[in-house]
Amino acid sequence: MVFSRDIPSPASMFSTYASMMGYVMIIKPMINTIIPRPVQNFVFSYLKSFAGSRSSTLTLTIDQMSSMYIPDELYAAAQAYLSTKISPNSVRLIMARDPAEKKVKLYLSDGEVVSDVYNGIKLKWRFLARNKNNTMVEEYGQSYQGNIQRESLELSFDKKHRDLVVNSYIPYVESKAKEVNNKRRILKMHCYSHMAQTWQSVNFKHPSTFDTMAMNDDLKRSMIEDLDRFVGRKDFYKRVGKAWKRGYLLYGPPGTGKSSLVAAMANYLKFDIYDLQLASVQGDAHLRSLLLATNNSSILLIEDIDCSVDLPTRLQPPTETSQPLGAVQVSKPLTLSGLLNCIDGLWSSCGNERIIIFTTNNKEKLDPALLRPGRMDMHIYMGHCSFQGFKTLASNYLGLSDENDDTHPLCPDIKHLIDGHVLTPAQVAEELMKDEDADAALEGLVKVLKRKRLEPKKCDDESKMKKLKEGEEAIADAELAVLTPAQVEDKEELVASEYANVMPEWLPRSRLVMVLPGFHRARGIRRGLGDEM
């Protein structure tokens, strides 16, 4: 039994507390004076770690970005996995609707906790989002300052299950995330943003497929077989010691379907596309950082590589301009060797299942280093529209059957007129879109084909007339400039150089002798040929 006299009065308790605080205020300055601050910090940290080590909970942190500012694949996999674990009892969620989708998506909000159970082990996921005042200094000399939101996930569990979680649960999360992503797979088109200093993406909804491509059937079949063989040979590439990548060079006139073929490849493989504009790359180091930030199972596209940027070669080093003392150092420009090292050198192995595509309108203008054997695995010529391509386009736009060659009375005429370099697939598609009626559309196409057939003859006639006119003017200039044999003896080299610029290559030698008899006789006498010339 507790008596009231055993309980201290409030006054005595307050007096005791005041006395203790007085002792602390006296002792604390003495401790700070006698014991150095580093020693105090060490003692406090040791005591804190000793007290914390008694906890049985282990927490693993997964950051959104790695130390090299590269998106962490494990973080993306965990986000996809947790999207299927959101409980109806969740308190805070983020709701968003993608412009290209109909469904509303729910995401974890800051501080939200999701519970999970794996093989009897209880685990807790916690989402964290924090803003940081960060100054990012890039190696190419530019800096950006602002509030940057860094996201992370914390996974907490009993520390005795650490090996099981790391070796079994995490791979399980990655496999489930892959299944989720395949079900809700939305292709993305990525481009580099100067403001964000990273890749930014939009949904890729291009309708092009191999079925809609106006290509030769054999070439189309060869492309599909090559892509299937590539994605299924992971072990083969590892066994032979090659990076798991594939390169394609698409070349041909404008409007022949190079970009549409890239879209068809992306839709067939379900690969994202990274559209790399070389003009936005500020050096070899910047290019490496951009390629390291791309995901696996993707397509790297560099369009119009012949005219996108002037790449210095090893034989043509970039010119260095002098800068004032104290000025910001500008990085060296992008070089051809830097590009080749990234797509075909040691850096190309930093990724798996990647496809690299170059497009150009003029293959002959490319540097020989880009065309050497083994650089790009396949060179695909995208030429003018053939009759087979026309049948595919007629089936797409007019609904005509492409099984035989006489689905329409005008097909034989079109087959005869379209052979050769007449129209590109884009031009044929433009004509077929002018009218929904098949008869009217095909009649218009026949008229265009006939007109295009006549244009080369007209151009040849005009070219011949132009050459004839140039020849007559050259002959007139030569007659006015004719020299005497004595002048030729003294200044033969000067005369020869003048006439080399005046005379056309196609002018017959007999005509030259008639115009310049003294000139040729003098050269003949000098060389011991007499009048035989």
Curated annotation (Swiss-Prot):
SMART domains: AAA (SM00382). GO terms for biological process: response to stress. Keywords: ATP-binding, Hydrolase, Magnesium, Membrane, Nucleotide-binding, Transmembrane, Transmembrane helix. ATP binds at residues 252-259. It is a single-pass membrane protein. One of its GO terms (cellular component) is membrane. SUPFAM superfamilies: P-loop containing nucleoside triphosphate hydrolases. It catalyses: ATP + H2O = ADP + phosphate + H(+). PROSITE patterns: AAA. The chain crosses the membrane at residues 11-27. It comes from the Eukaryota. Its main location: membrane. It is found in: Membrane. One of its GO terms (molecular function) is ATP binding. Its EC number is 3.6.1.-. The keyword Transmembrane applies. CDD domains: RecA-like_BCS1 (cd19510). Its cofactor is Mg(2+). Belongs to the AAA ATPase family. BCS1 subfamily. This is AAA-ATPase At5g17740. The lineage of its organism: Eukaryota, Viridiplantae, Streptophyta, Embryophyta, Tracheophyta.
